């Protein structure tokens, strides 16, 4: 059986590429090679899975920023590394957050409140 974190990571990628509305639990189960029942047993419902994917996405961004900061030899190099990644981060963020804001406003509110703290 696949590890839950792998399912979250792969589903996050799918949501960024195709949007949260376009991806159904059937699509995720099929893509991951698991039954829909297993998916529901692991996550309960799509809303819970989206929340976990969003947390994973933010954590991935935080980890990338930390790696870039550690890799840089000085502040200017750190800034250049961050600029290099900025477009891809923002593109993925916008695609993911737009769908969540429109179709899952409760999750959006929780996520934006958590990030403000």
Where on the chain are the PLM-derived regions?
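Residue-level detection of the helix-turn-helix DNA-binding "recognition helix"
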Residues: 30, 44-45, 55
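Short hydrophobic/aromatic patch on the recognition helix
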Residues: 33-43
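Hydrophobic alpha-helical connector segments
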Residues: 52, 66-92
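Short secondary-structure transition hinges
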Residues: 87-117
């Amino acid at each position: 059986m696949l590890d839950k974190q792998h399912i979250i990571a792969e589903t996050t990628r799918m949501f960024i590429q195709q949007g949260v509305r376009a991806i159904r639990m059937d699509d995720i189960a099929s893509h991951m090679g698991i039954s829909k029942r297993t998916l529901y047993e692991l996550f309960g419902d799509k809303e819970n899975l989206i929340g976990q994917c969003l947390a994973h996405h933010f954590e991935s961004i935080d980890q990338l920023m930390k790696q870039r900061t550690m890799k840089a030899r000085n502040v200017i190099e750190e800034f250049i590394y961050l600029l290099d990644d900025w477009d891809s981060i923002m593109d993925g963020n916008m695609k993911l957050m737009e769908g969540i804001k429109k179709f899952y406003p409760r999750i959006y509110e929780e996520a934006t409140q958590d990030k403000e703290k």
